[in-house]
Amino acid sequence: MDYKELANLIFPDAKDISYYEEKYPERDLPEGAIVTRFAPSPTGFVHIGGLYQSLIARKLASQTNGVFFLRVEDTDQKREVENAVSGIVSSLKDFAIEPDEGMISEEEGKGNYGPYKQSQRKEIYQAYAKYLIEQGKAYPCFCTPEDVEEIRAKQEAAKIRPGYYGVCNIMVISFQKDLNQRALSM
């Protein structure tokens, strides 16, 4: 099995990245323009740090004739607070921080580069993940959260810098070698 086959097994229905590159072309902005974003999680109120970050992002985009957008990082749906997106939009407006594009209410976004809720961009990310696997630059991980926690605990106990060091990449390569040897012995 090669990387392309592996990618097709994992993401059989993912579109080719050329589809998204055509759908989301490079923005027609002046040279030096900056595109900035504020990506809060809808888990409660906007705090002063979030306001500061969005103010700086808004100013940088404005000063360079760029774009400031609001994309909501709603992937932690267990902690999501009802009507938090409306609260975020309202808080930004209270401080005269208005995005050029992105979420403008709980369910509505404005702009040509949406969707502006992270959870609704899954197909885009799958297409690029498939592309990276095809290139051999990414691999599937089969570890559970408990496995990752166990690895981290062992590393900390051994006073090793915690990190995930390609455990499943080695598994994929080993699995592929095993398949290749089986094919040769037939």
List PLM regions with ranges.
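Active-site cores that bind ATP or allylic diphosphates and position pyrophosphate for catalysis
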Residues: 139-186
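N-terminal Rossmann-like or analogous alpha/beta NTP/dinucleotide-binding catalytic cores
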Residues: 2-156
